[in-house]
């Protein structure tokens, strides 16, 4: 085996084209497949961008190079220095004839998982051997689209004058008063893993930042075992001052629309590889009220009372009717957290919204309460002690502007963009009730 020494990759596989006929290149990656046929060997090298064929004819290479090629195993790490030779019969209109092959590392055999995708594996097996699973081109395509999604979102926020922030993930109490928190030992105290940056986002509005966003982990100790829930997730959160819930919804529409447009422009190969039925949405999404959603569900035989949260059956009924991306607005105040602003004309209804894709909720937001007295009243009415929120409430005593915001589930949005039916497909190392490794 060789060290990398003075060799450096000159091209990824997708950068080599027939017009480079006669040019010398250095390629590095994994042995995707190997076929040795007497005096001829075919080596398919795979790197991050795809695959490329190296043809090793015994009469055109030295003895050592041919001997190395014949002994290669699947998933060995290799480097090839060779010449591009145009050939209309080759898969991409060219092949590479090696001048030298270096084996940088050997892979054990048999492989516990087949990255070539010729042998199917259950998702639990794939997640157990995730380092091999993510070598698969289709899996890499999912995460390249996810990466472009995050890049696009950051750019949209930056172009809009937002400040990126980082809030604590070790907290002293529940953000929303719930009990679904992971407790941890924090020296002599009890602490929790943060379930939301919500309170900190609002405190920054009191600090005069005007517009902030954060992309970070959240933790929920919910005992779900579904295809759409995880206990550790990435949340894309924003908060804006001197706006209402309609402005927040407009910003969310812009973020989502730009993601679709940027992915279409920058990741066409991944869209094709995943065979996605890609369609950029309209710049504004359909909107229905909670009451209208209830009516749709009831009309489809799903009984739900006004004031109840939407059940899975109700979400499916509404999703079947609406399709695509749409907002549900005007939620019952009792279904929303204490910091959600009720309507002036009817305090049973609040200025909250959910962004749905078919039956899947991908974002939730609202205009927030910015008056101290109302906030204290809401906390008390929900059976919580305002003293537990002392540092948060203090920010509302000395000049808190009207504000609104939302949180968008990055993992769920990636599910939508890549048309996956299990959220675990879109997370490198998912954490759920059963899985804490790798």
UniProtKB/Swiss-Prot annotation:
Name of the protein in question: Aspartate--tRNA(Asp/Asn) ligase
Domain of life: Archaea
Family stated for the protein in its record: Belongs to the class-II aminoacyl-tRNA synthetase family. Type 2 subfamily.
Assembly and oligomerization: Homodimer.
Compartments where found: Cytoplasm
Native organism: Methanococcus maripaludis (strain C5 / ATCC BAA-1333)
Catalytic activity: tRNA(Asx) + L-aspartate + ATP = L-aspartyl-tRNA(Asx) + AMP + diphosphate
Alphabetical UniProt keywords: Aminoacyl-tRNA synthetase, ATP-binding, Cytoplasm, Ligase, Magnesium, Metal-binding, Nucleotide-binding, Protein biosynthesis
Described function: Aspartyl-tRNA synthetase with relaxed tRNA specificity since it is able to aspartylate not only its cognate tRNA(Asp) but also tRNA(Asn). Reaction proceeds in two steps: L-aspartate is first activated by ATP to form Asp-AMP and then transferred to the acceptor end of tRNA(Asp/Asn).
GO BP term (any one): aspartyl-tRNA aminoacylation
Taxonomic placement: Archaea, Methanobacteriati, Methanobacteriota, Methanomada group, Methanococci
UniProt binding sites for Mg(2+) 2: 361, 364
Annotated positions for site Important for tRNA non-discrimination: 91
């Amino acid at each position: 085996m060789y060290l990398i020494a003075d060799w450096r990759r000159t091209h990824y596989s997708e950068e080599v084209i027939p017009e480079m006929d006669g040019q010398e290149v250095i390629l590095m990656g994994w042995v995707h497949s190997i076929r040795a046929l007497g005096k001829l060997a075919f080596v398919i090298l795979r790197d991050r961008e795809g695959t490329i064929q190296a043809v090793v004819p015994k009469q055109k290479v030295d003895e050592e190079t041919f001997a190395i090629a014949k002994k290669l195993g699947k998933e060995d790490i290799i480097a090839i220095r060779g010449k591009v030779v145009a050939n209309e019969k080759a898969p991409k209109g060219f092949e590479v004839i090696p001048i030298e092959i270096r084996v940088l590392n050997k892979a054990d055999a048999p492989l516990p998982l087949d990255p070539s995708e010729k042998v199917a594996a259950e998702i639990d097996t794939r997640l157990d051997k995730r380092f091999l699973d993510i070598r698969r081109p289709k899996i890499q395509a999912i995460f390249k689209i996810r990466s472009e999604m995050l890049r696009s979102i950051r750019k949209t926020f930056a172009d809009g004058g937002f400040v990126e922030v980082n809030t604590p993930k070790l907290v002293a109490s529940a953000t929303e008063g719930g009990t679904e928190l992971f407790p941890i030992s924090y020296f002599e105290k009890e602490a929790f893993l943060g379930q939301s940056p919500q309170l900190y986002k609002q405190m920054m509005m009191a600090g005069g930042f005007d517009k902030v966003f954060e992309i970070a982990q959240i933790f929920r100790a919910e005992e779900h075992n579904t295809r759409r829930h995880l206990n550790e997730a990435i949340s894309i959160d924003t908060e804006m001052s001197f706006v209402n819930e309609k402005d927040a919804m407009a910003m969310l529409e812009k973020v989502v629309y730009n993601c679709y447009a940027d992915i279409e422009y920058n990741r066409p190969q991944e869209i094709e590889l995943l065979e996605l039925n890609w369609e950029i949405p309209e710049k504004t999404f359909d909107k229905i009220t909670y009451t209208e959603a209830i009516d749709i569900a009831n009309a489809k035989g799903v009984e739900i009372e006004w004031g109840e949260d939407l059940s899975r059956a109700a979400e499916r009924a509404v999703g079947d009717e609406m399709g695509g991306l749409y907002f549900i607005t005007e939620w019952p105040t009792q279904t929303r957290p204490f910091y959600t602003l009720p309507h002036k004309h009817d305090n049973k209804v609040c200025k909250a919204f959910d962004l749905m894709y078919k039956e899947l909720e991908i974002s939730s937001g609202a205009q927030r309460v910015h008056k101290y007295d109302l906030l204290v009243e809401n906390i008390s009415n929900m059976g919580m002690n305002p003293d537990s929120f002392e540092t948060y409430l203090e920010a509302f005593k000395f000049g808190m502007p009207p504000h609104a915001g939302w949180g968008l589930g990055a993992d769920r949005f990636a599910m939508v963009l890549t048309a996956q039916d299990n959220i675990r497909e879109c997370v490198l190392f998912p954490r759920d009730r059963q899985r804490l490794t790798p």
